[in-house]
């Protein structure tokens, strides 16, 4: 099996459920989990994940509370923090204090949807940042990725916002990008079926699934969410 990263929005429907989901996922052979930090203007996200952000914010979920929750768990998979730039640079105790805490927690990298690829090298954040690549990324920018310290590259397999879709466009471009970069290439945005996961595994190093998991969380009773998420991930990776 190739790589699989799950996106789990922190605080949806509450932080205790998030904690249980993260622990339940530890029983699976997955690469990692992106823990999503809620933000009031999640411009890169579709309606399913936007709703999760809104619920978490109404619950009073903050970056600080998310870190407190992460301190309570121990998992074998890789942890990533997905956050818009604002909650990072405006962390109450300072950005550097936040990064120190992430290091102590063993977080492998930051995923910042509103940070353009060209700004990744310029921003003053001394922490691995996962760069985004899209179908319209220029060749010179692809080559620059090899100078960035990052755990992997996040390929956006569609234009616009996150969400589920049926087809898998840009397969040829994904192959082209894979040849040009030295870092592992993970494909996200719109992956919702095992057939799509299998197709991505044929041409890239892994997949990232978000909306399909958040939708299951939205449709399930609170106490059933951890087992429902695990079952959905098993279905996606083809594990019985």
Swiss-Prot record:
Tetramer of two alpha and two beta chains. CDD domains: Tryptophan_synthase_alpha. The alpha subunit is responsible for the aldol cleavage of indoleglycerol phosphate to indole and glyceraldehyde 3-phosphate. One of its GO terms (cellular component) is cytosol. Pathway: Amino-acid biosynthesis; L-tryptophan biosynthesis; L-tryptophan from chorismate: step 5/5. Keywords: Amino-acid biosynthesis, Aromatic amino acid biosynthesis, Lyase, Tryptophan biosynthesis. Belongs to the TrpA family. It comes from the Bacteria. It catalyses: (1S,2R)-1-C-(indol-3-yl)glycerol 3-phosphate + L-serine = D-glyceraldehyde 3-phosphate + L-tryptophan + H2O. This is Tryptophan synthase alpha chain. InterPro entries: Aldolase_TIM (IPR013785), RibuloseP-bd_barrel (IPR011060), Trp_synthase_alpha_AS (IPR018204), Trp_synthase_suA (IPR002028). Its EC number is 4.2.1.20. GO terms for molecular function: tryptophan synthase activity. It is an enzyme of class 4 (lyase). The lineage of its organism: Bacteria, Thermotogati, Thermotogota, Thermotogae, Thermotogales. The active site is at residues 34, 45. It comes from Thermotoga neapolitana (strain ATCC 49049 / DSM 4359 / NBRC 107923 / NS-E).
């Amino acid at each position: 099996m190739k790589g699989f990263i799950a996106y789990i929005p922190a605080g949806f429907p509450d932080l205790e459920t998030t904690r249980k989901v993260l622990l339940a996922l530890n029983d699976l052979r997955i690469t990692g989990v992106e823990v999503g930090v809620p933000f009031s203007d999640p411009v890169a996200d579709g309606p399913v994940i936007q709703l999760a952000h809104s619920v978490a914010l109404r619950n009073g979920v903050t970056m600080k509370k998310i870190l407190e929750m992460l301190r309570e768990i121990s998992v074998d998979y890789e942890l990533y923090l997905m956050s818009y730039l604002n909650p990072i640079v405006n962390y109450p105790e300072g950005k550097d204090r936040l990064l120190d805490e992430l290091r102590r927690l063993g977080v492998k990298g930051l995923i910042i949807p509103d940070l353009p690829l060209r700004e990744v090298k310029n921003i003053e954040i001394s922490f691995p940042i996962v760069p985004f690549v899209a179908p319209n990324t220029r060749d010179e920018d692809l080559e620059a990725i090899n100078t960035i310290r990052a755990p992997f590259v996040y390929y956006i397999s569609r234009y616009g916002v996150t969400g589920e879709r049926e087809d898998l466009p840009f397969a040829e471009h994904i192959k082209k990008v894979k040849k040009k970069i030295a870092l592992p290439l993970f494909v996200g945005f719109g992956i919702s079926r095992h057939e799509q996961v299998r197709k991505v595994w044929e041409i890239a190093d892994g997949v990232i699934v978000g909306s399909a998991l958040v939708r299951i969380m939205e449709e399930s009773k609170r106490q059933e969410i951890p087992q429902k998420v695990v079952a959905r991930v098993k279905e996606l990776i083809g594990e019985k």
